[in-house]
A protein has these predicted regions:
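Short, strongly hydrophobic alpha-helical membrane anchors
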Residues: 13-23
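Single conserved hydrophobic/aromatic residue that forms the stacking wall/gate
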Residues: 1-14, 215, 222-224
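Hydrophobic, small-residue-rich transmembrane alpha-helices and their short perimembrane loops
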Residues: 21-217
């Protein structure tokens, strides 16, 4: 006779086989949908960057904005990385390396989506202004595409991360509870980075507004 532990292991293996048999095609379809979303965001990026950036003066102003935005992003992501590493160590210590890996995957892909989306949005600003000089429809099209890039990246990378990591965990015969913890950690990592980016972005834009207002009132106080 089998012990209860051996019977439980057999049941778990049979359960996983049923899941993989019935849902593997669905998981692959979801992964393919994520690939399509990322690929389409890449296509939209190419369309935006290939459009006209306006005259020399517009490009000069746009370059200054892009330099400032990139400097802000680099500084912000350094801070996020420090906090992220600390949280990663805590999660890995109290749970397991698989949960920590899930957290890392979510945080990394969320950071990639935010960084790429921000850079594309900044580059799209001047192109939207130039297109709007021709007609409002052209400007609206570029603005809509630039906004769609971030949304597509977030959705596409999320689908890819969840489905692929889930398939890996199933194939490794990981306990069901551990799988849930790992996937929750993946979502937690993505949410943590997005919260930092959202709050930091709001503070950055508000600071830029304040500086512009101060500059208009008194040039000599801009350094203060």
């Amino acid at each position: 006779q089998w012990s209860s532990s051996a019977a439980s292991d057999v049941y778990k293996r049979q359960y996983r086989n049923i899941i993989m048999t019935n849902y593997l095609e669905l998981l692959y379809l979801i992964s393919f949908t994520g690939i399509l979303a990322v690929a389409y965001s890449y296509l939209l990026s190419g369309q935006i960057l290939s459009s006209s950036a306006g005259n020399a003066r517009m490009q000069e102003i746009a370059e200054a904005i892009q330099i400032g935005a990139k400097a802000y992003l680099n500084r912000q992501y350094k801070t996020i990385a420090v906090v992220g590493i600390i949280v990663l160590a805590i999660v890995s210590y109290f749970f397991s390396y698989l949960v920590g890996l899930g957290y890392f995957i979510g945080a990394f892909l969320s950071g990639v989506a935010g960084y790429v989306g921000m850079l594309i949005s900044v580059k799209a600003n001047v192109r939207t202004a130039e297109a709007s000089r021709q007609n409002l429809q052209s400007g609206l099209t570029i603005a809509f595409k630039s906004g769609a890039i971030t949304g597509l990246l977030v959705a596409g990378l999320a689908l890819l991360a969840i489905t692929i990591y889930y398939i890996i965990l199933i194939n490794l015969n990981v306990d069901n509870r551990e799988i849930i913890n790992a996937l929750v950690a993946l979502g937690f990592g993505a949410s943590l980075i997005s919260i930092f980016a959202r709050l930091g972005g709001g503070i950055f834009t508000k600071g830029a507004d304040a500086v512009s207002y101060t500059h208009l009132r008194a040039h000599e106080t801009i350094a203060d």
